C-alpha cells in the first residue's frame, strides 16, 4: 500500500543529496503521481508501444525500473511466447518493493528483477528498452555510452523509450514550463516548503538535458529515427527506432 508523500512537509536542517531510499520508496507512487505531469499516460502508452514492438523470443529491458510500473505495463501487453523482461535498479528499497509488485500480478511473461547498476548490465536480443526518467540521474559524461550500448543490444526494428525531465534552450519557454510544473505540484497539494526542499536535494543529482541534446545523442548512438511522442510542461518521452535493415 502506498502512503502519502509528506517527507518534506517540515523543515529539514541539513538537506543532503537525493537518494531513492526506504522512505522515498514507501511513498513513491504518490510522490510521482503528484510530481510528474503525465506520468500515468506515459506508463500506459509504454504498454501500447510494447504491443507494437516486442517480438517473440526477445527480451525487454526496463533500466531504472523503480517499483516496476513500466515493467508491469509492458508485461500486460506482451502477447507472444518466449519473451522475458529484465528490470534493473540500483536502489535496494525500490527493488524489494518492485519484486513484491511483480509477484502480485501473475502473467505468462517472466520478469527478472535485478538489483544492480544499469551501466554494467549487458543488453542482448532486445526488441524494446525503457529508460523511464532514469538517464537524468546518470552523470552527463556517461549517458552516451549507455545509449550506444542500448543501440548495439537492440535487434533491428527495436525501440527505445526515453522519458525525461527537460531543460530548454529558449530561456523564456523554460521559465514558463518550470513555473507551470510548480503550479501543477501546488495544485496537487505540495507546499512551497516541500517544493523547495525537494528541489534543493535534487539539484546536484538530477541533471536535465534539452530535447535537442537527447536527439543528438540518439543519432550518435546510431538510431535512424527519434521523436518526442509525449510532452506535458517540462516532462516528456521520446521514442528512438533502430532501422529494420540495421546491421
From Swiss-Prot:
S-adenosyl-L-methionine binds at residues 39, 64-66, 89-90, 117-118, 132, 199. It catalyses: prephenate + S-adenosyl-L-methionine = carboxy-S-adenosyl-L-methionine + 3-phenylpyruvate + H2O. InterPro entries: CmoA, Methyltransf_25, SAM-dependent_MTases_sf. One of its GO terms (molecular function) is S-adenosyl-L-methionine binding. It holds the Pfam family Methyltransf_25. Its EC number is 2.1.3.-. Coiled coil: none annotated. It comes from the Bacteria. It is an enzyme of class 2 (transferase). This is Carboxy-S-adenosyl-L-methionine synthase.
